[in-house]
């Protein structure tokens, strides 16, 4: 009986080697029987060894009386003690039963829960946990090998032949420093030539960028070992994704490994946020020049028609909303050979209109660029992979069953040893497969190419006014907790208080004292009383002025930026701003003026993290202030990469303002633990693990912890150690926190609910606390700010409302 052909997902089901088996003869020789009947047959035998777990590859079907039977699908049979469990190929449980069968043989037919199964072979536990039917590596499903060599229709001696020299490549591959691309498997020197990156581009590439260009070329051309004709370049911000992309595009436009072809593609489309359209155009002309390439920016439907009719242009740059509107109104008539999506985390949901509309393009070669490929969960990454290589990870449900759920279960505080090993195996399997088309490098490789960067986190002591208003809001929350949408409303108010109590001036509830509701509220003295952050900001701007250091101030709230704008005007600081309300036509000019102007012309740029946090080049600045942390750590990572990137020539300092003990700091702690899954999967860093939070975590958000230091430090050290460190007579206490703190004392004492909620599982080290997230940071308690070892160039030498700070240097 022949087995019906089914689609074999290259990751979940791999390749099944079929053997020519006469199933009709097997059914005649081996009568199908119930497992329970076998149990009766072998009952009473004392030498049966069933105390082990065994795994089998099977095919299954529902029990039917049809004459010509077909198998419905593949699956697994797990025998544990006397229990047999049947799973589908996507690990959906199909049924189970109790059995005393001593041995299961290949080709044997069994019946379990109304299903008839045929045993194919026994597999190892490693193969089962990895989620593959066989141990063979994945084969390229897109490039089948030629079965027969091409034969010309005429005999060689009857064809007119001329003796000619072998074809030559566009650039010499033997020159020192030449970057030569991979050759195809069917290489023939008579019909193929080497593809060599143009020297005027390759001479500017760093080593990691040369590797990236080679990787992207192999993926986009479907070279041996690559899956599909697409790729994801997921380098962290600042590593030069734009330059690598331009190099690959230019190479494909001007070269082909076929000697009789002048190019691999005829055109390419770059889809990016509207704030980056002009930046992409400038980058193309900056690296290639106006004489080599012609770029067209499409802002309406007529621009797309102009691009298709005018062969002068080979690159079209457009925004996500623009191209989606065009495709919805005019269909998918535009022919694009290469689709490039910048800031591709916009495609993190398969149900979004952007994903659905762009996926209608009949473009096989697709390149996604993103510095944050995994912001929240694995389903976002699955969505991006499914956009470039449909079906490579199976269906959404099968992906969740086979990978996402086991991986997340393995990071639960209650995970068993089996859950941990299964999750690790699935994670490794997923990483190995996706590494065929995903390239991810971390920003630390920039250290040898860029000047040093210093990160400073300031744990700021709130003013008395902030503490009073904060407590008043929390008291009101406890009495109105059942109101719909009240949680989000309170969180927004608490976040505003961390920045300044003035931001609540227009609230209906009377949170503020009467003296701060009159017309004098915006005087400098009253503004400083409303926020310790403004006090720190004033001191920093004064120190920046001495060294002529330009600064970028980043906030996610428009009201906060407007308040800072007013404060800068009072201090007579010249500034420019880029907010969500800034017209797109003016944004490029603002960035250009800020980068090229002198310190006296513009010393500060106010930047909205949501409007301008992606892709902007602000290397004219050397100081960046993150005024409040974002729930999404990717936003802050995007922001700091605006000034610390290729092209930066001077040392950089990143400041993060946190109101100690308030919502600010709790978000910051959540940030550093939230990146565990991204680090462990995308970066393949086994030391970083996902943190799981319980309901206790949510409760602690609506509280204020007044401490002498900060919550972050208390998570890393026990109270006895804190007292011994903070009560020393030294005016400054410095701690190099580069190793794990001992947990022996914590076992005998009760720890806080927040710390319990912050614990997670590490495969190698067991239960860990968030101190691992802050390894390598140096802690300081500035009772006297006249001495600041390591950060004296970045912190003003005057008394400031700072409980403590931690800093880290990247060089």
Swiss-Prot record:
Report which residue ranges the record marks as coiled coil. Answer: none
Q: Identify the EC number(s).
A: 3.6.4.12
Which InterPro entries does UniProt cross-reference here? Helicase_ATP-bd, Helicase_C-like, P-loop_NTPase, SNF2-like_sf, SNF2/RAD54-like_C, SNF2_N, SNF2_RAD54_helicase_repair
Q: Which reaction does it catalyse?
A: ATP + H2O = ADP + phosphate + H(+)
Annotated Polar residues bias: 20-33
A GO term for molecular function? ATP hydrolysis activity
SUPFAM superfamilies per UniProt: P-loop containing nucleoside triphosphate hydrolases
The protein's UniProt keywords, in alphabetical order, are: ATP-binding, Cytoplasm, DNA damage, DNA recombination, DNA repair, DNA-binding, Helicase, Hydrolase, Meiosis, Nucleotide-binding, Nucleus
Using the UniProt record, name the top-level EC class of this enzyme in a single word. Answer: hydrolase
Q: Where is the Helicase ATP-binding domain?
A: 222-391
- GO-annotated cellular components: cytosol; nucleus
Residues reported to bind ATP: 235-242
Q: Name one GO biological process term.
A: double-strand break repair via homologous recombination
Region Disordered: list its residue ranges.
20-42
State the signal peptide span.
none
Where in the cell is the protein located? Cytoplasm; Nucleus
PANTHER family from the UniProt entry: DNA EXCISION REPAIR PROTEIN ERCC-6-RELATED, SNF2/RAD54 FAMILY MEMBER
Q: Quaternary structure per UniProt?
A: Interacts with dmc1 and rhp51.
Provide the family line. Belongs to the SNF2/RAD54 helicase family.
The protein here is known as Meiotic recombination protein rdh54
């Amino acid at each position: 009986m022949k087995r019906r052909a089914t689609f074999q997902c290259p990751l979940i089901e791999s390749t099944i080697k079929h053997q020519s088996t006469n199933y009709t003869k097997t059914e005649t020789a081996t009568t199908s029987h119930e497992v329970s009947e076998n149990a009766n047959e072998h009952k009473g035998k004392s030498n049966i060894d069933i105390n082990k777990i065994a795994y089998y590859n099977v095919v299954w079907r529902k029990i039917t009386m049809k004459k010509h039977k077909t198998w419905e699908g593949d699956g697994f049979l797990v025998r544990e003690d006397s229990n047999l469990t049947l799973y589908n190929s996507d690990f959906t449980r199909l049924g189970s039963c109790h059995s005393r069968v001593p041995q299961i043989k290949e080709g044997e037919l069994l019946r379990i829960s109304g299903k008839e199964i045929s045993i194919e072979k026994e597999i190892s536990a490693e193969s089962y946990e990895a989620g593959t039917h066989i141990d063979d590596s994945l084969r390229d499903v897109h490039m089948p090998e030629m079965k027969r060599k091409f034969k010309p229709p005429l005999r060689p001696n009857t064809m007119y032949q001329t003796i000619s020299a072998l074809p030559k490549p566009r650039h010499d591959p033997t020159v020192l420093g030449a970057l030569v691309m991979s050759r195809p498997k069917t290489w023939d020197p008579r019909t193929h030539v080497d593809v060599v990156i143009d020297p005027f581009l390759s001479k500017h590439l760093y080593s990691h960028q040369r590797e990236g260009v080679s990787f992207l070329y192999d993926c986009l051309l479907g070279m041996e070992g690559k899956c599909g004709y697409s790729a994801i370049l997921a380098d962290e911000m600042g590593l030069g994704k734009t330059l690598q992309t331009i190099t690959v595009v230019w190479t494909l436009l001007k070269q082909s490994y076929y000697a009789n072809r002048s190019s691999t593609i005829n055109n390419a489309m770059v889809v990016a946020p509207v704030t980056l359209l002009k930046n992409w155009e400038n980058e193309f002309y900056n690296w290639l020049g106006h004489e080599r390439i012609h770029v067209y920016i499409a802002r309406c439907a007529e621009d797309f028609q102009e691009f298709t009719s005018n062969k002068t242009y080979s690159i079209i740059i457009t925004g996500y909303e623009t191209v989606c509107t065009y495709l919805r109104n005019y269909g998918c008539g535009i022919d694009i050979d290469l689709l490039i999506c910048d800031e591709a985390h916009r495609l993190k949901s398969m149900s979004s209109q952007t994903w659905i509309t762009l996926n209608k393009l009949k473009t096989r070669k697709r390149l996604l660029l993103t510095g944050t490929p995994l912001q929240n969960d694995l389903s976002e990454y699955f969505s991006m992979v499914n956009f470039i290589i449909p079906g490579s990870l199976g269906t959404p449900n099968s992906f969740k069953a086979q990978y996402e759920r086991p991986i997340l279960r393995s990071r639960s505080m209650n995970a068993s040893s089996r859950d941990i090993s299964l999750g690790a195996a699935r994670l490794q399997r997923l990483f190995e497969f996706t590494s065929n088309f995903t390239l991810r490098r971390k920003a630390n490789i920039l250290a040898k190419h860029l000047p040093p960067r210093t990160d400073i986190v300031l744990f700021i002591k709130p003013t008395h006014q902030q503490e009073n208003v904060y407590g008043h809001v929390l008291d009101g929350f406890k009495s109105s907790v059942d109101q719909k949408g009240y949680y989000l409303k309170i969180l927004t108010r608490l976040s505003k208080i961390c920045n300044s109590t003035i931001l609540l001036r227009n609230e209906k509830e009377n949170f503020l004292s009467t003296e701060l509701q009159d017309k004098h509220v915006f005087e400098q003295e009253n503004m400083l009383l409303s926020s310790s952050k403004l006090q720190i900001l004033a001191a920093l701007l004064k120190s920046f002025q001495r060294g002529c250091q330009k600064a970028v101030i980043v906030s996610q709230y428009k009201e906060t930026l407007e308040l800072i704008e007013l404060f800068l005007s009072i201090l007579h600081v010249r500034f420019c701003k880029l907010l969500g309300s800034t017209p797109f036509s003016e944004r490029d000019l603002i960035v250009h003026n800020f980068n090229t102007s002198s310190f006296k012309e513009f010393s500060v740029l106010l930047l909205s993290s949501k409007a301008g946090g992606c892709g902007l080049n602000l290397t004219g600045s050397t100081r960046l202030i993150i005024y409040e942390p974002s729930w999404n750590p990717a936003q802050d990572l995007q922001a700091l990469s605006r000034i610390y990137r290729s092209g930066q020539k001077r040392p950089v300092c990143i400041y993060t303002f946190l109101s100690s003990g308030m919502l600010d700091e709790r978000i910051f702690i959540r940030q550093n633990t939230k990146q565990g899954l991204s680090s462990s999967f995308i970066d393949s860093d086994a030391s970083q693990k996902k943190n799981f939070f319980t309901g206790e975590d949510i409760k602690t958000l609506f509280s204020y912890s007044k401490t002498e230091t900060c919550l972050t430090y208390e998570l890393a050290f026990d109270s006895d150690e804190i007292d011994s460190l903070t009560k020393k007579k030294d005016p400054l206490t410095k701690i190099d926190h580069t190793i794990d703190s001992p947990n022996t004392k914590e076992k005998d004492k009760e720890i806080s609910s927040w710390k319990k909620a912050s614990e997670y599982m590490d495969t190698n080290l067991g239960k860990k606390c968030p101190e691992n997230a802050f390894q390598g940071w140096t802690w300081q308690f500035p009772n006297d700010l006249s001495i600041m070892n390591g950060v004296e160039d970045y912190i003003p030498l005057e008394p400031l409302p700072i409980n403590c700070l931690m800093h880290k240097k990247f060089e």
